Amino acid sequence: MNAETTDGKRVSIIGAKRSGIAAALLLQQRGATVYVSDREPVGDAERAFLEHHGIAFEEEGHTDRILEADFSVVSPGIPPHASVIRRLEHEAIPLFSEIEAASWFCPAFIIGITGTDGKTTTSSMVEAICLSGANSREQRVFSAGNIGVPFSSLVGEMRKGDIAVVELSSYQLERCRSFRPDVAVITNIMPDHLDRYGGSMKRYAEAKYRIYAQQRKQDTLVYNADDETLRAHFEGGGAFVPQLVPFSLDRKRASLGGACYAAIEGDWLITVVNGREEKVITGSGLFKRSFRGRHNLENALAAVAATRAAGVDVFPIREALRRFAGVEHRQEYVRTMHGVDWINDSKATNLNALRQALDATPGKLVLIAGGRDKGDDLSDLEERVRQKVSVLVVFGESKAKFTEAFSSVVRVVPALSLEEAVEQAQRYASTGETVLFSPGCSSFDMFESFEERGMRFKKHVEGMQS
């Protein structure tokens, strides 16, 4: 399927959330007859949008009308084993993701970014760098994908010569068949979402690897050489079509990838392009109170490698990194009260992100953790909790699991709500410590999203009397 072959086609869109209705409008504008179907009630805003644009839809179930289609676009939140997917597959109806469908109409240079952790921060840095390095007033930079605006909502505005920075989850990549970023980035691969992949890390990683499946020799693939899974995959002797550009905190390790890489040399973040070294920025120039830690060095390396591959010069990269202050809900500084710093890391929805937050936070801390359990093994955190955490405040569905795992190494205080957790943390935190809200779990037990969870945390912290 491509931009030339959608005109006159019948398309069923499965899922009436943001990406689904964005794909529906795009395909309708490109000549397709579109039908949207959702098993849940359609929201008021989505209903008004669909009715305004004359897009037919159904709700609270999928009728056989979805089978009257030449192909279907499936929203990322619908798992591969869902009954509606089985029905479509039984009728041999081709299934695509919203990202795939949008890419058919994209004339811009695409930088695609995926990984378990660091996607949003890296995407935000890449966007900032590209804006800093835009080579003319006519060149525009668009940011789309996993967390922000759907790709389908923006491709109609893009022109040749623009840059599209697209953040991609494994869910979005699963049904990509021809999507081909000019530069692809994989930040890391750690256990996450394994319930969707039958507990298989291999299947999860394979979904991530679809980001480069259609790349050509002139394209670039940036990967984290410090990640064991990625290092084994890309440095295990296999043949890969795009140019590989590794990044690493260890220059020697990065240099094994060839003539192009990004690494740390002393206090400097450097790139090497065709054997020529370029000093970009020092760690002291990069780090701020709201942006610190080993993982953010890795994110910066990924962003630098990607934007150099896209042709951005070193000077605008340096200037953009100096100004970059981090991303909301990712180790975000909220306030200091009575000598205690309060940090919002609501985006830590898995244990690796929690581990990174513990490593990045200086000194002793009171940790607020909990939420919906993803089946992760908490024992990996025991030594870090012993060394770093003075009091652990737990809430949400997983509080019993956290209590069982850590009550022998640290004082554990249960809370019935996030607000109570904040109040307990204030009670136990001492001057000079940090209160770190880094749940290590998904938000769906009590909140619609990690963003809502983070906003609730910040609102309560900002409202406390000093």
From Swiss-Prot:
GO terms for cellular component: cytoplasm. Its main location: cytoplasm. It is an enzyme of class 6 (ligase). Keywords: ATP-binding, Cell cycle, Cell division, Cell shape, Cell wall biogenesis/degradation, Cytoplasm, Ligase, Nucleotide-binding, Peptidoglycan synthesis. ATP binds at residues 115-121. InterPro entries: Mur-like_cat_sf, Mur_ligase_C, Mur_ligase_C_dom_sf, Mur_ligase_cen, MurD. Pfam families: Mur_ligase_C, Mur_ligase_M, MurD_N. One of its GO terms (biological process) is cell wall organization. Pathway: Cell wall biogenesis; peptidoglycan biosynthesis. GO terms for molecular function: ATP binding; UDP-N-acetylmuramoylalanine-D-glutamate ligase activity. It catalyses: UDP-N-acetyl-alpha-D-muramoyl-L-alanine + D-glutamate + ATP = UDP-N-acetyl-alpha-D-muramoyl-L-alanyl-D-glutamate + ADP + phosphate + H(+). Its EC number is 6.3.2.9. It is found in: Cytoplasm. Cell wall formation. Catalyzes the addition of glutamate to the nucleotide precursor UDP-N-acetylmuramoyl-L-alanine (UMA). PANTHER family: UDP-N-ACETYLMURAMOYLALANINE--D-GLUTAMATE LIGASE (PTHR43692:SF1). Belongs to the MurCDEF family. This is UDP-N-acetylmuramoylalanine--D-glutamate ligase.
